[in-house]
Amino acid sequence: MKIGILSQFPQLYSTQRLVEACQSRGHEAVVINTLNCYMNINSIKPSIHYEGTELVGFDAIIPRIHASVTFYGCAVVRQFEMMGVYAANDSISIARSRDKLRALQLLSRKGIGMPVTGFANKPNDIPDLINMVGGAPLVIKLLEGTQGIGVVLAETKTAAESVIEAFLGLKANILVQEYIKESNGSDIRCFVVGDKVIASMKRQGPEGDFRSNLHLGGCGEVVKITAVERKMAIAAVKAMGLVVAGVDILRSNRGPLILEVNSAPGIEGIEQTTGISVTEPIVEYIEKMVAARKTNRPIIA
Ligand SMILES: Nc1ncnc2c1ncn2[C@@H]1O[C@H](COP(=O)(O)OP(=O)(O)OP(=O)(O)O)[C@@H](O)[C@H]1O
Ligand SMILES: [Mg+2]
Ligand SMILES: [Mg+2]
């Protein structure tokens, strides 16, 4: 197969590992810088051009769309879909999961547990909004933040009111969320491919930070997840329609709660913490899907 890896960063560990996994399973891997793709949208033969030539002959793509380029990245993935190329994460699912509000709304419809979350537009909604999620302390999040940036813990009602006012004054879209204190600055990251959790780790934030993101200095350790957590992670990925995803779960007093589903989950942290290759299963999954598409057999993966 010829597999395109959509990434702006060819030197990144994750990009390199995906290339290696494709090659070790006998496929051709091409790293494509998403932002350098330009598209010809027409009803006869939609195409993508790249550095002066047309991209042809691809069987599948693995999108690694960075949060800062969601709009353009999804357009490129969608164009590949229009050309009949299999996308291991399609454009609709990436867009769904990237917007934390949309994602939580979809998860809530499936009855998947999550911290109580509020969303508002007008500043005069603030006191009731704060009460709705159980009062302070509470967490305030930018809708499209990532790597823990734009996730704030407001310890008091006054702090919460001023942070919410400031964000809304800047026209930022924010979520207001119940703070799960008992998770103690840690969460569980499950790496899912298809309908399987391939690897999981517990992430613990640095001393004094409630955020567990590895990019902010958190560290990972191997963890055994429960059957309920496994089921929940898989259901969340299915609700998004993703095939490759990183699911963040908080362990709360009322059981596991989903925080979010990431469509371009980090690969370095989970592989180094667990010693499990998560890239091989991605390529294996793509092989099954592409083969099933060709023969029109029902897809069992
Ligand atoms: N409601 C909450 N209660 C307790 N801790 C929370 C809550 N929300 C977020 N956190 C902590 O903050 C971290 C970052 O939050 P979240 O995953 O929502 O943001 P992110 O910026 O999208 O991160 P990622 O890099 O995983 O995409 C979480 O991993 C968790 O440790
Ligand atoms: Mg995220
Ligand atoms: Mg997260």
Swiss-Prot record:
Q: Name one Pfam family in it.
A: Rimk_N
Q: What class of enzyme is it?
A: ligase
Query: Where is Mn(2+) 1 annotated to bind?
Result: D248, E260
* Cofactors, names only: Mg(2+); Mn(2+)
The UniProt record lists the ATP-grasp domain at 104-287
Which InterPro entries does this one have?
ATP-grasp, ATP-grasp_RimK-type, ATP_grasp_subdomain_1, RimK, Rimk_N, Rp_bS6_RimK/Lys_biosynth_LsyX
Q: Which keywords appear in this protein's UniProt record, sorted alphabetically?
A: ATP-binding, Ligase, Magnesium, Manganese, Metal-binding, Nucleotide-binding, Protein biosynthesis
What is written in the cofactor note of this entry? Answer: Binds 2 magnesium or manganese ions per subunit.
Detail which positions bind Mn(2+) 2: E260, N262
Q: Which annotated residues bind Mg(2+) 1?
A: D248, E260
The UniProt record lists the EC number as 6.3.2.-
Can you tell me which residues bind ATP? K141, E178, Y179, D187, R211, S212, N213
Source organism superkingdom: Bacteria
Q: Which GO terms describe its molecular function?
A: ATP binding; metal ion binding; ribosomal S6-glutamic acid ligase activity
Listed GO biological process terms: protein modification process; SOS response; translation
Q: Which residues bind Mg(2+) 2?
A: E260, N262
* Family annotation (PROSITE patterns): ATP_GRASP (PS50975)
Q: Which GO terms describe its cellular component?
A: cytoplasm
Task: Give the family per the record.
Answer: Belongs to the RimK family.
In Swiss-Prot or TrEMBL terms, this protein is called Probable alpha-L-glutamate ligase 1
Q: Which organism is it from?
A: Shewanella baltica (strain OS155 / ATCC BAA-1091)
Q: Which gene encodes it?
A: rimK1
